[in-house]
Curated annotation (Swiss-Prot):
Organism per entry: Rickettsia typhi (strain ATCC VR-144 / Wilmington)
Keywords for this protein: Ribonucleoprotein, Ribosomal protein
Matching PANTHER family: 30S RIBOSOMAL PROTEIN S2 PROKARYOTIC AND ORGANELLAR, SMALL RIBOSOMAL SUBUNIT PROTEIN US2M
HAMAP family: Ribosomal_uS2_B
Domain of life the protein comes from: Bacteria
Pfam families: Ribosomal_S2
Entry protein name: Small ribosomal subunit protein uS2
Length: 295
């Protein structure tokens, strides 16, 4: 199992990963991941977050290294654009608008919707369309296409079930999680203090509402996927320096450039060697100046 570079607890603190929800909203199943509370807000134990993040990143790395497909899922407003951005950067797939029931368990229906989307695009791009259809009909087709794109843009090239699901906000994405469980698809998920960690193969205790936190998670996820992809390409004899595209992964030139910039994984210890005293002091200082996005 490959090991990644140590997770920087200070970086997690700066991103507000330690801020949970109000104590009145907690899920008792998260008790073991909670460090304490400040002003009626639960504080997440970042030592556990760092260690479990390392495990989750290794799962992402190994999945992509073996040519597996990853589906990133988060339809909440503050995560939507970030999820799409980083999924595209690492050549993977995403759902960021609305989870359509059966996206995993009833793939045939979803495939039909994707086919419908492609037909609409082809029709609208045709020069004959302006002659054969009225302006109203063209407008109706354009609206249908846009609606389908909102839900399907990130999975239109996904021809089979994903090998790993990566979720931010398990409460909001419970339907996606239930479908993945039915199909035995392993799940990486950020679990906040109001979350249920059951059925999550790789839980990462952390704030799932803060934009800064979400961006940090997605950046780490994408880097792990890119490193796995690079390793897979090396095994296949692909020269990343001269490669212009990799159709199986739907890579863009931006993705290839990102591959070259991604820091390498190392076989070092998974977590920063901070003492409990240092961690306690850093956490205390952070809580004194807290700026939580959770409620």
């Amino acid at each position: 199992m490959s090991k990644i570079s140590p997770i920087n607890i200070k970086e997690l603190l700066d991103a507000g990963v330690h801020f949970g929800h109000k104590t009145s909203r907690w899920n008792p199943k998260m008790a073991s991941y909670i460090y304490g509370e400040r002003d009626d807000v639960h504080i997440i134990d970042l030592r556990q977050s760092a260690a479990l993040m390392s495990v989750a990143l290794n799962a992402i790395y190994e999945t992509v290294k073996k040519d597996g497909k990853i589906l990133f899922v988060s339809t909440k407003i503050q995560a939507s654009d970030i999820i799409a951005e980083y999924a595209e950067k690492c050549g993977q797939y995403y759902v960021n608008n609305r989870w359509l029931g059966g996206m995993l368990t009833n793939w045939k229906t979803i495939a039909c919707s994707i086919e419908k989307l492609e037909k609409l695009e082809k029709t609208l791009e045709s020069e004959e369309t302006r002659v054969c259809y009225t302006k109203k009909e063209i407008l109706d087709m354009s609206r249908k296409k846009d609606k389908l794109l909102l839900s399907l843009a990130g999975i239109r090239n996904l021809n089979s079930k994903p090998d790993l699901l990566v979720v931010i906000d398990t409460n909001k994405e419970h339907i996606a999680i239930n479908e993945a469980v039915k199909l035995n698809i392993p799940i990486v998920a950020v679990v906040d203090t109001n979350s249920n960690p059951d059925n999550i193969n790789y839980p990462i205790p952390g704030n799932d509402d803060s934009i800064r936190s979400i961006r940090l998670y997605c950046s780490l996820f994408a880097d792990a996927a890119l490193q796995g992809l690079e390793e897979s390409m090396k095994v296949s004899g692909v020269d990343i320096g001269t490669m212009q595209e990799h159709t199986d992964k739907a890579l863009t030139s931006k993705t290839i450039s990102k591959l070259k910039q991604t820091k390498k994984f190392s076989k070092t210890q998974n977590i920063d060697e901070e003492t409990n005293t240092e961690f306690d002091q850093a956490l205390s200082d952070a809580c004194e100046n807290k700026n939580s996005d959770n409620t």
